[in-house]
Every structure is written in C-alpha cells, then in structure tokens.
Design a protein with these regions (language model features):
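Membrane-interacting alpha-helical segments
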Residues: 51-74, 123-131
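An amphipathic alpha-helical interaction surface
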Residues: 93-177
C-alpha cells in the first residue's frame, strides 16, 4: 500500500468518525431538548399562580355562562383563567411543533386539560365574540380536542393501574432503573 492510499484510508476513517460523532451529538441534543421541554412543563404546573388558577377553574360549575364565570371568579379570577389557558395554549403549540409528545402531556395533564376545556368553553366562546377573535384560546381548544380524540379510542387508565406491579410497563420501568 502506497502512502497516497494510506492517506486516503485515514481520511475516510476520520470523516466517518466525524459523521458518527456529529450524529451522536445531534441525538444527545434532541434528548436534552425533550428533557428540558418536559421539565418546563412540570415547572409550569408547579407555579402557585397556575395551581391557584387551575383549582378555581375546576371548581366552576359545568355549563356556567361567561357572566356566571365572571361573577363567581371576579377580576382576579379572570386573570387566573388567562394564566391557566395561556399555559394550555403553550402546551398545545409545543405539541403541534413536536417539542412535546402527546404521551407526556397525557401523563401529566389529560384530566386537567379536559376539565378546564369543559368548564371554560362557554367563557371562551363569549371572549371570542366579545373581541371578535376566533383565535382566542385556539391552541387550548386544539389541545383539548386532541386529548378528547385520544380518550375516545382508549379510555384514560390511571397510572397506578396501567403501570402496576406485574404489568409489562412496570417490568420495562424496572429494567430502565
């Protein structure tokens, strides 16, 4: 083997190693971005303002008109609604753009999203009419509809049942630890 062939071989090995390294770095970056998105999601749910707002929303009576919601919650309560719906909006956008998976959202928030939408639909409709903006809470609605579609094909199963000792998912969890 002459020196030129050896140099070409070394060059090919170096380029291949570089491509493999770059692919590994990209994969690791994507995993980190997914983890960061999930942590951000958890943090949004753990803020005192969000928790207070969600509690106020889920305590609303079903089918309450927008005026009833305003009367029950008052101006500060309406501010809390904006905070909760903005969080759902953000999660909807992140899901649509592939930054979060529907599985993660379902694990964290399926119940609160669906209950919030059920409680706030009349209020949202009124706000859209009042401000002539059908885009008000558009991603919240989109997200709630995706969650409803998901539950229409497979009913929600609590984690303590779906991942109980003896299930395949529990066994997978044990092996990942």
């Amino acid at each position: 083997m002459d020196i030129s062939t050896l140099a070409n071989l070394i060059n090919a090995v170096a380029v291949t190693a570089g491509v493999i390294f770059a692919a590994t770095q990209i994969r690791d970056y994507r995993r980190q971005r997914k983890r960061d998105s999930m942590l951000s999601l958890v943090r949004s749910f753990q803020s005192p303002t969000f928790a207070r707002g969600l509690r106020r929303v889920i305590e609303l009576p079903d089918n309450a008109s927008a005026d009833q919601v305003r009367e029950i919650l008052g101006p500060e309560g309406e501010d809390l609604i904006v905070h909760v719906t903005a969080t759902w909006e953000t999660i909807g956008v992140l899901l649509f753009h592939g930054e979060l998976t529907i599985d993660i959202i379902d694990d964290f928030f399926s119940g609160p999203i669906l209950i919030s939408w059920r409680k706030l639909l009349p209020y949202t409709t009124d706000i859209r009419q009042q401000y002539q903006r059908d885009t008000w809470s558009e991603w919240f609605q989109w997200l709630a509809e995706r969650m409803m579609e998901r539950e229409s094909t497979a009913p929600a199963v609590p984690a303590y049942i779906a991942h109980a000792r003896g299930t395949k998912s529990y066994d997978r969890w044990l092996h990942r630890r």
